């Protein structure tokens, strides 16, 4: 596949409005800055509509919810839909509690999302599949060998692109599905690594035309996975060093290295 959106992110520095969780705010902002995007971290209901007038992308991440956040997310999501700003949903722990289930269902009913990014448990919940997650972690379930089909089914259900992240990532628009075979076992050991991926996807959508969101999302996930591989080189269990290396790699990676390292496979039914 061709890689063209990474350079556009660096050239255009898209302003991304992140309504994300308090655990990952700093890590997400630093990752976006390293990549070349411009994060705007605000969850004030009184200003989120105005922000959509100049933002290029919106991330909604439900990791640490409160009622004010929910209000801000609904207002921002609807405003983004009106102005044509792409919206990414990260339904952290979607099936873990009744409160989260109801909030996610409300968001999906009232906001049009360009991309939904989640782990197997979260995407499985959206598909109605019997996955057993542990808190906000992925867990295992009946469709553990059919992740490609799982991503595809949710993409069809909600008419959007789905990024199912894990040991390998599956990206689907409901018709086409790619498997990204890059990555490292160290990424899940860093709090917020999945949440930052959602933010990176949103940045790539911010420089992409709507008809190419699938390619932009696939490229974002590939950049992320390859950066993780490069950051892990020479490390075993030094997770703190890995986290710093990973931010560095997001800033250093370029299309030539990406094309050389990427292992992206088209899935066939």
Swiss-Prot record:
Source organism of this protein record:
Actinobacillus succinogenes (strain ATCC 55618 / DSM 22257 / CCUG 43843 / 130Z)
Is Hydrolase among this UniProt entry's keywords?
no
Task: Give the pathway annotation.
Answer: Cofactor biosynthesis; thiamine diphosphate biosynthesis; 4-methyl-5-(2-phosphoethyl)-thiazole from 5-(2-hydroxyethyl)-4-methylthiazole: step 1/1
What is the name of this protein?
Answer: Hydroxyethylthiazole kinase
Check the record and name the InterPro entries matching this protein: Hyethyz_kinase (IPR000417), Ribokinase-like (IPR029056)
Q: Which EC class is the enzyme in? A: transferase
Q: What does this protein do?
A: Catalyzes the phosphorylation of the hydroxyl group of 4-methyl-5-beta-hydroxyethylthiazole (THZ).
Key words of the record: ATP-binding, Kinase, Magnesium, Metal-binding, Nucleotide-binding, Thiamine biosynthesis, Transferase
For ATP, which residues are the binding ones? 117, 165
Disulfides per UniProt: none
Q: Which BP terms does GO give this entry? A: thiamine biosynthetic process; thiamine diphosphate biosynthetic process
The lineage is: Bacteria, Pseudomonadati, Pseudomonadota, Gammaproteobacteria, Pasteurellales
**The protein's Enzyme Commission number:** 2.7.1.50
Family indicated by similarity: Belongs to the Thz kinase family.
The Gene Ontology terms for molecular function here are:
ATP binding; hydroxyethylthiazole kinase activity; magnesium ion binding
Q: Pfam families annotated for this entry?
A: HK
């Amino acid at each position: 596949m061709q890689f063209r959106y990474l350079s556009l992110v660096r050239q255009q520095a898209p302003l991304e409005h992140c309504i994300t969780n308090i655990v990952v705010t700093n890590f997400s902002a630093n990752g976006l800055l390293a990549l070349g995007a411009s994060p705007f971290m605000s969850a004030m209901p009184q200003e989120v509509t105005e922000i959509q007038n100049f933002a290029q992308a919106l991330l909604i991440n439900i990791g640490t919810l409160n009622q004010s956040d929910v209000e801000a997310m609904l207002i921002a999501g609807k405003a983004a839909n009106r102005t044509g700003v792409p919206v990414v949903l990260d339904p952290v722990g979607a099936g873990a509690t009744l409160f989260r289930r109801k909030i996610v269902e409300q968001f999906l009913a009232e906001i049009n999302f360009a991309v939904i990014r989640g782990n197997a448990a979260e995407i499985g919940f959206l598909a109605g599949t019997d996955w057993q997650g542990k808190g906000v972690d992925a867990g295992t379930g009946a469709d553990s060998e059919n992740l490609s089909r799982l991503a595809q089914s949710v993409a069809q259900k909600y008419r959007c692109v789905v990024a199912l992240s894990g040991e390998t990532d599956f990206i689907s628009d409901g018709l086409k599905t790619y498997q990204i075979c890059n990555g490292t076992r160290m990424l899940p050991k860093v709090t917020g690594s999945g949440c930052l991926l959602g933010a990176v996807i949103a940045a790539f959508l911010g420089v992409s035309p709507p008809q190419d969101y699938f390619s932009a999302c696939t490229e974002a996930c590939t950049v992320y996975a390859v950066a993780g591989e490069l950051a892990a080189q020479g490390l075993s269990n030094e997770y703190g060093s890995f986290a710093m290396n990973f931010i560095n790699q997001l800033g250093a990676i370029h299309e030539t290295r990406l094309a050389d390292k990427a292992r992206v496979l088209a899935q066939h039914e």
